Amino acid sequence: ILVHAGVEADLPVNQQDRETYYYQRFYSQRPHHSGKTVVCGHTIQGDLPTNLGYAICLDTCAYGGGWLSALDLESGVIWQANEDGKSRRMSLGDLPIG
């Protein structure tokens, strides 16, 4: 499930409140009842994305001088770039779960 901020775990995607899509914080994300992985941003994670196993947050503070992060959903490869022109690549599997 690709979303800006998050989803309510107990509701189908088509029954979600827009406020949740836009403003929910990642630390309140629970596993979605569908079993699908939630991929979002909106809540800064520091230099690396966070993988909870059931949810992934890619917000690494690009607007505040941090890294811009992108995830290839098929391969699990994460690319990052910053304002200094540096880039790096890692696998979703390289991130600790939790």
Give names to the regions the model predicted.
Residues 1-67, 73-88, 93:
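Acidic, His/Gly-enriched loop-helix segments that form or flank divalent-metal centers
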Residues 97-98:
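A short C-terminal boundary segment appended to hydrolase-like catalytic domains
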